[in-house]
A protein has these predicted regions:
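Sec-dependent N-terminal signal peptides
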Residues: 2-13
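Beta-propeller domains with acidic blade repeats across secreted/periplasmic ectodomains
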Residues: 12-331
């Protein structure tokens, strides 16, 4: 009796696991579809547009039902080049391809894209496999902000300008470099108040993955590509001679343009490759995290939670593990 009572008491006091509060519902994928999800955008009617690394976009319905096994996949677009971002905006779906910001829409109402326009194809690429492009997000200037990955390894067609940058693109397709020093900026998102934040992956010149706000003229720490800042398109101060082997706060004293991160993600304890993010705007419907930020991680197949605050004009915050156990990396 004593043993039974003790065990019952322990069962009542042990905290429940995260899976008891936030379930993961796996949507079955038709056998004929190779998904390799690279971007997701939820439309006003609840339909999910799902892009794939291979260049397809599917519209997925039925994902909000209690039983997601009835979800339907329909091909919306195909033939894109590595689309890594979708944004529904003013009747169009904007898509970030490897070297081009495009927009597309379905004008016939049959669920298939029938109109595709190039907004800007000025983003240089050298042919390196790692020259990904992410976004777009609407910036405080009303333009589309996109981020460009630096290359890793050979550059078959020579060094390309504006790699490791944030680019602001207006409706006319004009592109203006806005921030430098990015490494592998896999997530870019507009905040509810209009600023744009991005996530960067750990590696050389970036000791741990991070979350940072982006402001025009910022330098984010990686020296690759800063030679592009000597071109006339760069209208801010030029950063040169980035010191090696010093902590970020020390470098900030030497390079005032350096943007200190709002949050560092502890290596391995909080993944290694943060990517896409979303603010909780449900006003409590998703739990006690209203206004906080959720960040996915590609390496760790997880979702992290971030609480931010602004102190004396600077953003800082804390990060927490939120949900493990995804079946693949999330981007």
């Amino acid at each position: 009796m004593v043993i039974t009572t003790t065990l019952c008491a322990l069962a009542l006091t042990l905290p429940l696991g995260e899976e008891e509060y936030y379930e993961i519902a796996t949507i079955p994928i038709p056998d004929e579809i190779v998904l390799e999800v690279s971007a997701i955008e939820i439309l006003e009617d609840g339909t999910a547009l799902v892009a794939t690394r291979r260049g397809d976009v599917f519209s997925v319905t039925g994902i909000w039902e209690d039983d997601v096994s009835s979800a339907q996949f329909n091909l919306y677009a195909q033939g894109l080049q590595e689309p890594l971002g979708l944004l529904s905006h003013e009747g169009w779906v904007y898509v970030m391809q490897r070297g081009e910001l495009s927009r597309m829409r379905d004008t016939r109402g049959d669920g298939r894209m029938d109109e595709l326009e190039t907004i800007c194809d000025l983003i240089p690429i050298s042919g390196n496999y790692h020259e990904y492009s992410f976004g777009p997000a609407i910036g405080p200037d009303g333009n589309f902000w996109v981020t460009t990955n630096k290359p890793f390894g050979g550059e078959p067609f020579g060094r390309a300008d504006w790699r490791g940058f944030t680019m602001s693109i207006n409706d006319a397709g004009e592109m203006h470099p806005t921030c430098s020093g990015l490494r592998s900026p896999a997530g870019v998102e507009s905040s509810p108040w209009g600023d744009v934040f991005y996530t960067d992956n750990q590696g050389e010149w970036c000791g741990a993955s991070k979350l940072s706000i982006m402001k025009p003229g910022d330098f984010h720490g990686h020296p690759h590509g800063i030679a592009s800042c000597k071109k006339e398109e760069w209208t801010y101060s030029v950063v040169e001679n980035v010191p090696d082997g010093k902590l970020f706060p020390e470098v900030k004293l030497e390079i005032p343009e350096l943007r200190l991160p709002a949050v560092w993600f502890p290596y391995d304890k909080m993944g290694r490759s943060p990517a896409g993010m979303a603010w909780d705007m449900t006003e409590g419907k998703f739990g006690p995290f209203a206004g906080q930020l959720f960040v996915t991680d590609q390496y760790d197949a997880s979702v992290m939670r971030v609480a931010l605050e602004q102190v004396n004009g600077n953003w800082q915050g804390a990060c927490f593990p939120f949900r493990m156990g995804l079946q693949c990396g999330a981007i």
